């Protein structure tokens, strides 16, 4: 879960321990490690490369885009750095990246956007505080009911099936049902897990442990962290990898400017890229791994960022709003980012089915127009023209093909283990979608990078960490 908008019972997870122990479960390579090519300069690839480089290995990173960071992308929006991909360090107390950010001297601030301050429906109008609090309770209880719903509906049920069954049993008024469902389905499930609800597996939703300590935002953007970790590395940009050939002698990685030989390759490209088949493997990946890749998928969280000259949304200050327009799932989540950005800024989040269809059919102008129309609905008044806007396209970007992984109906966390398993002791895999318990997050990508470096023999990652003061 990348966007942790819901207060849940806290389950401690000592991810920090992974910094010391990760890699122990995967057998060490039997071939000597002489040169490693890392495919992808996102958090997983940069972390692995940093650790290998610090340990004295020869390592080269090939990155398809003309920038590093991958799904971390801090953009200067009219003089203000805004994160268009990952924005939150989830669970400050358990998140290993908080220690890394501390050690590098970055400033991060608490940013728990759990509260929905405003909710409105195009049909029912605005909801009051009592109704919002009740809907929050109704939505939250769904997660406590998951074991019973799974027993009732079976292993092939989707989250949409679960939500239908849950609300069928609650004798709520139509108005309370509308808001309760929007709180659960739009605000939590489609913005956290972000895939269309009929595709999300009921069995595996909400099985990722919540990290303790609340969420934080890095002032100046997440990009700084990845830039800092990448310092001094041999990174080749605009190198689209198209083919990986491996045999007993080593690997050859083919990309835009030619071919590079190495003893090992680490692929950190998103599952969406592996599914698309734009990287050929010779010989083909084992049937079991290809089948796992086919079963897994990426979700579709997208953002529209609205920057204004003046701040005019007092009722949303440091908070969030939930919109139910007349189009199902259309841009439901509004988040005030003004204090973190240092300028009047709203981030509009949307995911699920709506994101898939809107990304395929609407242009940027239309997406901004929909975001502004829904903002007017939320505030109940007209709004000025933004001074700057930014629209993301993670879903259609050929180098991400979605936002982050989720477990679809018919898949299971074991598929991520299968994806992670090395092939022929030459081809290694890392990235957020290769470790279920921390999947869909930046710290998951980071830990996967640490893990693969350790598997290749790195004893110390050389990545500094310091406690919060
Ligand atoms: C909108 C959005 C919001 C998010 N919010 C949060 C959040 O608040 N908190 C959080 O923890 N996580 C969040 N995430 C998830 C987080 O961004 C990812 O889990 C994490 O950044 C993934 O890192 P990675 O290294 O595994 O993959 P990536 O960052 O995707 O890196 C893979 C790299 O491979 C490159 N690549 C792809 N194909 C090729 C090729 N053929 N040849 C060479 N290179 C290639 C890509 O360009 C990319 O740079 C969010 C993601 C999105 C999209």
What are the functions of these language-model segments?
Residues 3-4, 12-16, 23-469:
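FAD-dinucleotide binding site
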């Amino acid at each position: 879960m990348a966007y942790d908008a819901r207060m849940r019972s806290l389950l401690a997870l000592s991810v920090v321990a992974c910094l010391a122990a990760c890699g122990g479960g995967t057998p060490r390579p039997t071939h000597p490690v002489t040169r490693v090519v890392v495919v992808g300069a996102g958090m997983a690839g940069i972390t692995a490369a940093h650790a290998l480089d610090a340990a004295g290995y020869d390592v080269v990173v090939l990155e398809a885009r003309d920038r590093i960071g991958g799904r971390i992308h801090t953009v200067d929006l009219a003089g203000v750095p805004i994160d268009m991909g990952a924005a939150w360090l989830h669970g400050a107390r358990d998140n290993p990246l908080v220690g890394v950010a501390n050690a590098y001297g970055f400033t991060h601030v608490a940013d728990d956007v759990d509260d929905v301050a405003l909710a409105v429906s195009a049909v029912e109008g605005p909801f009051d505080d009592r109704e919002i609090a009740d809907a929050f309770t109704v939505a939250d209880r769904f997660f406590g009911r998951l074991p019973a719903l799974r027993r009732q509906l079976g292993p092939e049920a989707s989250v949409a099936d679960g939500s239908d069954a849950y609300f069928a049993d609650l004798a709520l008024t139509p108005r309370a049902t509308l808001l309760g469902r929007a709180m659960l389905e739009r605000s939590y499930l489609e913005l956290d897990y972000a895939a269309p609800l009929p595709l999300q597996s009921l069995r595996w939703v909400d099985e990722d442990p919540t990290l303790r300590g609340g969420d934080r935002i890095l002032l100046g953007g997440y990009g700084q962290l990845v830039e800092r970790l990448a310092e001094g590395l041999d990174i080749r940009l605009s190198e689209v990898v198209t083919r990986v050939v491996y045999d007993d002698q080593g690997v050859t990685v083919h990309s835009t400017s030619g071919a590079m030989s190495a003893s090992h390759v680490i692929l950190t490209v998103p599952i969406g890229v592996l599914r698309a088949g734009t990287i050929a493997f010779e010989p083909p990946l084992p049937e079991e791994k290809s089948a796992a890749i086919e079963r897994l998928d990426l979700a579709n969280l997208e953002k529209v960022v609205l920057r204004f000259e003046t701040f005019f949304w007092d009722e949303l200050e440091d908070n969030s709003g939930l919109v139910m327009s007349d189009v199902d799932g259309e841009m439901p989540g509004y988040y005030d980012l003004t204090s973190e950005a240092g300028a009047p800024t709203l981030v509009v989040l949307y995911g699920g089915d709506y994101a898939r269809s809107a990304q395929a059919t609407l242009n940027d102008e239309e997406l901004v127009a929909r975001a502004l129309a829904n903002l007017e609905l939320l505030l109940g008044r007209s709004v000025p023209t933004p001074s700057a806007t930014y629209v993301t396209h993670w879903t259609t970007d050929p180098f991400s093909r979605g936002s982050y992984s989720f477990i679809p109906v018919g898949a299971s966390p074991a598929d991520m283990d299968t994806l992670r398993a090395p092939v022929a002791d030459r081809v290694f895999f890392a990235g957020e979608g290769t470790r279920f318990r921390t999947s869909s997050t930046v710290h998951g990508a980071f830990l996967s990078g640490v893990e693969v470096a350790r598997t290749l023999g790195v004893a110390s990652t050389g990545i500094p960490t310091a406690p919060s003061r």
